[in-house]
């Protein structure tokens, strides 16, 4: 996105999440940024919180995993569906979030709509092009939650975006007693 420093948001956000014991599964532009930053290397476990570091060591995996191009989001939704089936929970109850911190193409919003419609809160680091309509903004960030138990959150400050994502994940973990 020409309005922001390329890859900065992706990398800072991933580092913040793994430092807070949150494994990152990604695709598309964020995967390229992660690879360039070495976050998909097993040695990146040293940037993790103690819990995720232990998981990475036991499973012999890096803390950031790649699942394809941006339009391969269905792979992540299949994973969420399998986690839902195995746990007996609705997808919306799982401690998962979606994020497009530096989205640059309208397809990212279409993909985000899929994630939200699946029941996963989705966080954006760039304003979607709907701010001209307060009604549309309301429906995407609040109103849709009544239908699908998820919505968009928009926060342009990467540090605050990460905090909001972590808070949402922790809220869901607490509700599950984990």
Range-by-range predicted roles:
Residues 1-178:
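Anaerobic metallocofactor- and corrinoid-dependent redox/one-carbon enzyme cores
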């Amino acid at each position: 996105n020409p309005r922001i420093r390329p890859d900065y948001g992706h990398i800072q956000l991933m580092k913040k999440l793994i430092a807070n014991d949150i494994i990152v599964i990604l695709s598309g532009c964020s995967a390229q940024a992660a690879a360039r930053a070495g976050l998909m290397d097993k040695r990146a476990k040293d940037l993790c919180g103690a819990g995720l570091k232990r998981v990475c060591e036991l499973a012999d995996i890096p803390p950031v995993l790649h699942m394809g191009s941006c339009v391969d989001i269905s792979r992540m939704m299949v994973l969420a569906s399998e986690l839902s089936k195995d746990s007996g929970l609705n997808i919306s109850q799982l401690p998962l979030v979606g994020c497009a911190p530096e989205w640059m193409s309208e397809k990212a919003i279409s993909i985000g709509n899929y994630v939200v419609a699946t029941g996963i809160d989705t966080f954006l680091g760039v304003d979607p092009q709907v701010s001209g309509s307060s009604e549309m903004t309301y429906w995407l960030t609040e109103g849709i939650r009544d239908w699908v138990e998820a919505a968009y959150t928009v926060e342009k400050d990467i540090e605050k975006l990460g905090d909001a994502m972590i808070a949402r994940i922790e809220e869901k973990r607490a509700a599950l007693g984990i």
